[in-house]
Amino acid sequence: MKLQASWSLIAVALLAFRADADGTAWDLEIVPLKPGIYLLQRPEPLRQPVEGNVLVIVNERDVVVFEGGGMPIAADNAIRLIRSITSKPVSHLVNSHWHGDHNLGNQVYRAEYPGITIVAHPATRAAMLGPPFKYVTEFDKDVGPTITEWTALKEKGELSERRSRLLDDLNLLLTDAKRIAVTPPDLTVADELVLHRGEREIHIRHLGKGNTEGDLVLWLPRERIVATGDLVVHPIPYGFGSFPREWIDTLAGIEALDFELLVPGHGEVQRDRSYLELLRTMLAAMRVQAADAVAKGLDLEATRKALDFSAFAPKFPQDDMGKRLFEAWWTSPISRSLWLEASGKPIVQADAGENN
């Protein structure tokens, strides 16, 4: 997901924030997966601001990391944990796609590991250097008014505990945003790159469009682990600026891999194909509905109202927070992409966060 805080998402953030949440939104913990393979994961995947999973691959002489973190502080935390695992240097950092919650820590890795190679798809590099990344310079404009308002309420003792904790994260976000120096990849992969590390092969592949134009996955055939970026997000998918038809094919490509563990862009590791199949089935069904809506001449808003996700919604979190996040993160944005696709209109990445 594009890390943005032009917070109609403030309301969403409140939904996804527990008053008793521990630490900051960028704290991570180590989850060993297999020998030499570790997941750095935030315990609460639905918490805002969002923060993605980081896959760490410790080889004989170096370390390969998949995902650069959503803020400099996230990269600080990840590197601290990596160094608690090994003293070996990080040689390669892979960004799965252009959304900032996967790469705004790149410059921290570059500073800590000067010889590092940052890898991404050409479309990711273009987005990071172009209009889609304009929002990175606008955190103060987006978050500042809310911080000012809530700080005044807190001083008067009128701010709820939930908002007070979220205010702490927003202040930290705004402070840390001053450290951001957009650091695009210096090696781009349009199809596949294979890193050979002894008996280990690390495949970095573009299987097709999906969540964005330039999604990369990382595949470890010997260990049977695939990391998908935001092509798969659990327990609620992200649908911002996505490509429904191609996404179905890309998910099928992931499903065809002989994986044992699937590391999503956010959320819990998947140990079977059921969630992957759910996403693919849902996208296929909604494409049929969108085509029917457009054939009837419905515009975007009418199509949004006509699309019926009720057959799939019960398979996602059903508490009040889950239902609202399912609408904010999935049904509303993916409906736009479904309508654009069915109408034969282009899906432009720069528009992904502006017209959801």
Task: List each model region and its residues.
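Boundary at the C-terminal end of the N-terminal hydrophobic targeting segment
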Residues: 16-25
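Conserved beta-strand hairpin/beta-sheet module of binuclear metal-dependent hydrolase folds
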Residues: 31-84, 216-230
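Active-site neighborhood of phospho(di)ester-bond hydrolases with catalytic His/Asp-centered motifs
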Residues: 66-68, 91-99, 119-122, 207, ...
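Active-site HxH/HxHxD metal-binding segment of metal-dependent hydrolases
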Residues: 83-185, 194, 288
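Core dinuclear metal-dependent hydrolase active-site scaffold
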Residues: 178-184, 188-220
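C-terminal regulatory/interaction regions
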Residues: 295-356
